[in-house]
Amino acid sequence: MKNQYIDNLILNLKKLPGVGTKQAEKISFFLLKQNENEVEQIINSIVDLKKNIKECQNCNFLQSNNICHFCMDKSRNKQLMIFETTSDALKFEKLGIYRGKYFIIKNLIENVKNANEPKWKDKLLHYASNFEEIIIALNPTIEGQITSNYIKVILEEVALKVTKLAQGLPINSQIDYIDPITLNLSFENRK
């Protein structure tokens, strides 16, 4: 379409994760059909989100207070699970199988050779010292593996028990389509 306003909105909507050109066009035309009040509510929700959501001072969990409800909850056990994002942690929380606390690192280490000391290192070391077990739950990407190994080394240096989530074959998968690294991990982590 050759309309600068629609094209500009489509361009900006495509910056959202998982939104391609088709989805951005759909959202744009949906918004055009809405009355001004409804569009304003959406805009205000986004502005309020940016103004009021911040990181917990202890664990970096995104929420609206200086200290998140997980950190304040004294009934949680002495386990700490480390994630890259708050949304990853929430997915695990919704399972209802974990009653510990969380730490969000936000930035993965991208390259072993050029690994500068991550900004979160000191905060993690300080916070993790309060727990009996640290569980690393980063995505199994190359950067996730590099970061997991780094975290394991720095936390074991201060005598903390560190474990990682097991990796292996996903349910409903076929071995023929599984990459060699995942096959190897599933073999090594067999029960």
UniProtKB/Swiss-Prot annotation:
Keywords: DNA damage, DNA recombination, DNA repair, Metal-binding, Zinc, Zinc-finger. A zinc finger (C4-type) spans 56-71. GO terms for molecular function: DNA binding; zinc ion binding. The keyword Zinc applies. One of its GO terms (biological process) is DNA repair. Transmembrane segments: none annotated. Residues 78-170 form the Toprim domain. It comes from the Bacteria. Gene3D superfamilies: 3.40.1360.10, RecR Domain 1 (1.10.8.420). Disulfide bonds: none annotated. Pfam families: RecR_C, RecR_HhH, Toprim_4. The keyword Lipid biosynthesis does not apply. NCBIfam families: recR. Belongs to the RecR family. May play a role in DNA repair. It seems to be involved in an RecBC-independent recombinational process of DNA repair. It may act with RecF and RecO. This is Recombination protein RecR. It comes from Mycoplasmopsis pulmonis (strain UAB CTIP).
